[in-house]
Amino acid sequence: MALPLFQYGSAEAGKFFTIEKESEAAKLFGLDRVGPIRFALQGGAKEVLAYTVSSDVEAESFEEIREAFESRSFNVFVFPEEISAEERANTKAWVVRNRQEGKHFLAVFGGSNADDQDPAIGNERTTQLADDYIVNLITGAHVNGSPYSSGKYAPYIAGLIAGTGINKSITYAPVQATDVGKRLKNSEIAAALQKGSLLLVHDGEKVKVEQGLVTSKKKIRAIRARQAISTDIPRTAAEAYIGKLDNSADGQAALISAVKAYLERLELNHVLTDIVVTLDPERKSEGDSVYLLIGFTETDSMERIFLTVRV
């Protein structure tokens, strides 16, 4: 997962660092500056791709961040804290543009402590950020007696998403927190879910994710499966087939077979089912271009159980 740093001690500015342990981050940036990285690793991220932002001018710094991460690979992006509405909009546009250009990742956002006290404000932020590739956390958390806004706790959620397999859901996943910033009523929880917000709840024993949703109201699990497929198939084709096979019936059949084999491996891991891979009948495959029609159904997780009790 990817994370820009605005505070990083004596570390070199304008540089990428790959962090796998909190101790590495503390040595590089100072113990009092590793909070966002600590949250990401505690959430489950195997490693954090951190970038030390060199500009101290807001507009320039965010442009620098987008430009720097443009050439790097990652599956989830998050800021270390809440950002302005303008930069949220700019980042959303960046996520959308990257998707259109073939680079697929989720972005996680949050808000301020003040915003977290009114779920309607968080839900409005969700509406503004509505997209298949964006997650908006609207509740903060208390950790070891200290309160954190949803913006500052967002790196934990980003780490949780990044570290969860694409065949698993983060719904009801417990998080490392002692309480939520504000406990919402059932009606507020229902309203937030209908908007596509991601929220934390305290169930009386622990703090957990209520439901793993992106801001378009779809499930994170399904979107991450699509992202993996959209990333892996072009990469596999480029590495093993492009420039190595003739664009003939035999070459096309070999490519189709390879794509099917990849999807079937995902099917065995309960990621998807109902696989279809054929040549696209609406676009002619000729010259150096092959157009495939790929269809599948994401495997859903059991997230809600309805019981009827007769007495």
Residue spans for each PLM region:
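Surface-exposed assembly/interface segments
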Residues: M1-V311
